[in-house]
A protein has these predicted regions:
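Bacterial N-terminal signal peptides that target proteins for export
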Residues: 1-10
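Bacterial N-terminal signal peptides
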Residues: 9-18
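Extended, charged catalytic domains and RNA/DNA-binding interfaces, predominantly
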Residues: 22, 27-457
Length: 457
C-alpha cells in the first residue's frame, strides 16, 4: 500500500513548481520527548531572516464537536485532537489506542460553524431541542445507540438536510455556538506552545450550493483567543456567497486587529462550480472580485480524504498519475456530474484559467498556492496508509470497516489516507505559519514528510 503513495506525492510536488509562487476540559499534560526531529528539533521560537525549514501540519480537522462527526459517533474533542497531533497517545472513538508515528508541528481545528454547539445539547436531551422537531428526536436516539449503521444513516440525512436547507430551526440558532466557540479558542490557547507545537484557531464555512455543490472554505486565524473570541464564526444560514465570507473576514480584521485567510476545498465535488468564471450569483467576474478572491484565499486544498482536486485524466491525459484518488462521480449529495464540469473543478487547470483571466480582468482570481489537509471527522489527523484511523468514527480500524459505505456514492475503502501541508515559515509559531500561508510558501503532500522548495522571481 505504501508503494503506490510515492508517485502522487511526486506529482503534487512537481505541480508546485508550475505555480511559481462540549466535553469537560482535561488538564494539559506535558508533551513527551518526540522521537521525530521534524517536530522536536525546533525549541526556539525566535525567527531567522528567512525560512530554513518546512513545518508539517493539517489545516482541516473536525472533532466530535462538528454536528456530522458527532452524529456518526465521534466523541473526541479539541483536547484529544491537539494531544494526538503533537504526538501523545489517545484513546480513539472506538476505544483503541491511537498515536502518530511522527508528531505534527502544528494543526488547525476547523469544526463546522453550521450547527456548532448543538450536538452536546441534542445528546443531553435539552428540551429546547428535543420535542420541537421529529428529526431532532431521531438525532437524539442516534447519539445514544451503539448501532453504527443507524448513526451513519442519521448523519447522512443531516448532511442532506444541511445541503437542502431543511435543518430544524433550533439547530440554526446562533446561541448554541457561543459556549462551543469560547471553549474551542481557549483550548487552542492552552495547547499552543510556540517553537514546539502551534495550535491554531479556525472553523469550516460549509456551503453546499445548488443541492450539494461543494464550495466549502476553511477559515484560518493568525490569532489567539483574545481576538478570535471577540466574534462568532460565520454560518451558511447567514450567507452562502463567498463574498459574504470575505466581508466577515474584513470585519473581523477591522474589529480585532487580527488576520484571517480562507482555504477552499473539494473542487472535485463542486459539479463545476469551484473555479467557474463567474461570481456566485452567476454575474460576470469583475477586477474587484478577482482581487478580493486573491486577497482572502491564498491557498487551495489539492488533496484530502475525499480525494484529490489537483488534476483529472480528462484534463491531463499525458499524466499517468492524474487518476490518483479520483472522486469524480458527482457532488457532495450524489447529484451526478455532467460532461464539461471537471474543467472548472481542478487546481492545475485553474492556474491556467487564472493567467488567462489576468489578461482580461487585470487580476487573477485563481492565484492559489498548494494546501493539503485530512478533513478527518474523528479528531485524529492521520494521513498514513499503515496508520489510518479513517475519515469517520464509524470506519475506524475494524475487521469489516472496508465493507461499510461512506456516503451515497462511495465506500469507506475509497477514502484516501491524505494529506498534510508543508509550510516554509521562519518559526513554529501561529504568526509565522500564517504569514507563510499568506505568502503561499507552502506545498502539499498525501502524507509523506518530503521537503520541496522552489525559488523564482
Amino acid at each position: 500500500m505504501k508503494a503506490k503513495q510515492i508517485p502522487v506525492m511526486v506529482s503534487l510536488s512537481l505541480s508546485l513548481l508550475t505555480l511559481a509562487a462540549c466535553k469537560p476540559d482535561a488538564p494539559v499534560a506535558e508533551t513527551p520527548a518526540a522521537a521525530d526531529a521534524s517536530a522536536a528539533s525546533d525549541r526556539d521560537a525566535a525567527e531567522p531572516a528567512y525560512p530554513t525549514r518546512a513545518y508539517f501540519g493539517d489545516t482541516h480537522v473536525h472533532t466530535g464537536w462538528s454536528a456530522d462527526a458527532g452524529l456518526d459517533g465521534s466523541s473526541l474533542g479539541p483536547e484529544e485532537a491537539f494531544r494526538f497531533a503533537r504526538g501523545d497517545e489517545v484513546k480513539s472513538n472506538s476505544g483503541q489506542i491511537a498515536k502518530l508515528k511522527r508528531p505534527l508541528d502544528w494543526m488547525v481545528i476547523t469544526d463546522h460553524s453550521d450547527g456548532m454547539g448543538t450536538i452536546s445539547e441534542i445528546r443531553a436531551g435539552n428540551p429546547e431541542m428535543i420535542g420541537t422537531d421529529e428529526f431532532l428526536e431521531k438525532m437524539n436516539a442516534a447519539l445514544k445507540t451503539s448501532d453504527v449503521k443507524l448513526r451513519n444513516t442519521v448523519m447522512l440525512e443531516a448532511v442532506t438536510r444541511q445541503v437542502n436547507r431543511t435543518l430544524p430551526k433550533a439547530m440554526m440558532d446562533p446561541k448554541w455556538m457561543v459556549s462551543a466557540w469560547k471553549h474551542t479558542v481557549e483550548i487552542a490557547d492552552r495547547y499552543n506552545d510556540p517553537g514546539k507545537f502551534s495550535a491554531m484557531i479556525g472553523y469550516e464555512w460549509t456551503v453546499n450550493a445548488d443541492d450539494g455543490n461543494n464550495l466549502h472554505r476553511n477559515v484560518v486565524l493568525r490569532d489567539g483567543a483574545d481576538k478570535a473570541g471577540q466574534v462568532l464564526p460565520l454560518t451558511t444560514f447567514e450567507t452562502e456567497d463567498p463574498e459574504g465570507l470575505w466581508k466577515w473576514m474584513a470585519e473581523y480584521e477591522a474589529k480585532t486587529g487580527g488576520k484571517a485567510l480562507a482555504i477552499p476545498h473539494n473542487g472535485n465535488l463542486s459539479n463545476g462550480r469551484m473555479f467557474e468564471e463567474t461570481r456566485f450569483d452567476k454575474s460576470p467576474m469583475t477586477r474587484e472580485y478577482a482581487t478580493a478572491r486573491q486577497r482572502w484565499e491564498p491557498l487551495f486544498e489539492v488533496t484530502q480524504m475525499k480525494g484529490q482536486s489537483e488534476s483529472h485524466p480528462g484534463l491531463s491525459p499525458k499524466d499517468e498519475f492524474a487518476d490518483w484518488d479520483l472522486w469524480d462521480r458527482g457532488n457532495l449529495d450524489a447529484v451526478p456530474k455532467k460532461p464539461g464540469m471537471v474543467r472548472t473543478e481542478y487546481w492545475r487547470e485553474s492556474l491556467k484559467s487564472g493567467l488567462r483571466l489576468q489578461g482580461t480582468l487585470g487580476a487573477n482570481p485563481f492565484k492559489y498556492g498548494a494546501n493539503a489537509g485530512t478533513d478527518t471527522h474523528t479528531g485524529l489527523t492521520a494521513a498514513e496508509e499503515n496508520n489510518y484511523w479513517g475519515k469517520l468514527a464509524s470506519i475506524e480500524p475494524s475487521p469489516d470497516r472496508m465493507k461499510r459505505p461512506f456516503n451515497k456514492q462511495f465506500a469507506s475503502f475509497e477514502t484516501a489516507a491524505s494529506g498534510y501541508m508543508g509550510v516554509w515559515a521562519k518559526a513554529n509559531t501561529r504568526e509565522a505559519l500564517w504569514d507563510a500561508m499568506q505568502r503561499r510558501e507552502t506545498f502539499a503532500t498525501t502524507g509523506a514528510r518530503m521537503t520541496v522548495r522552489f525559488f523564482g522571481g
